[in-house]
Structures are given as structure tokens and as C-alpha cells.
Amino acid sequence: MFLFDDILKGKIIIVGVGNTLRGDDGFGPALIEKLKKNFEEIGDRQYKSIPILIDAGNAPENYAGKIAKKKPDTILIVDAIDLGLKPGEYEIIKRTDMVETGFTTHNMSLSMFIEFLEKETGAEIYILGVQPKNVNLGEEISVSIQNTLDEISRLIFGQLF
């Protein structure tokens, strides 16, 4: 498993993927929102690197061209993915180590989106997959996922400071 200090290098784009109307599936967009608030609260302090934060919702393919034009060194895609773990547990997987899980609630297969970015940017691509508890329509993010959201936000923010 990778650590954030291993992967958050150079020009960074963090992409939150997920549907905020489906409980824990909204983890990716919720993390982006939390990170944006963290950076706004700190203001003009010096960071090692300020990432570009993109809430891609449930249509990451709509942002593929925009991401490619930014020519990042590192792309971290954050999504709720059924990894067979306990709810709230997560893994960071390098693109080259990724095995197609077959799980996505999005219009374009996550692996196709990632393949496009890999070809167009040459960036190191990582997937931060969080095990959801509940992805039912109309549900809120579960407590276990909220706790993970807080933890990951602190880890990312701390690494970039």
C-alpha cells in the first residue's frame, strides 16, 4: 500500500468521483469539498504543492480533456469502490497495479477514464479506493466513511504543508 508522501509529488491533480445522492458513493466529491475548505481556511501560507482539486461527480469523462491539458505529474482519483474491505477502509493503488474491479456507478468505466489520462498526460496515476457501506439513493454518507474522509483529508493536507 502506498502512503501519501510516496505519491503526492510534482504538479498534482486530485479528482473526486462519485454520486453525492447515493450515500457513501459521494466520498470522492465530499473529499474535494473538504480539501477546498481546508486550503481556503489557511489562506496564503506556503505549501509544498497546492493540488488542483476537481469534483468530477458521476461523470469523470467530462473532465478528462481539462485534466489532460493541465499536464500533471501525479493524478489521484478518489472513489468509493467495492474492494471487499470493511466499510471505511481504503487502499491506494497505482494504475499499473490496478486490476479491473468491474465496480463503477459511472457512465464511463473508471479504467477507460484512467487509460485516457495515462496516454494523454504520462502522469503517475493512483486510485484511492474507499470501501463504501451504503450506496443507496437518498442516503447520507455513513459514519465510518465520514471518519475516513476526515482522516484522509488530514493526511493529504498535512503532506502538502
Model-predicted segments: where are they?
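N-terminal catalytic or cofactor-binding beta/alpha core of small enzyme domains
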Residues: 1-133, 139-151, 155-161
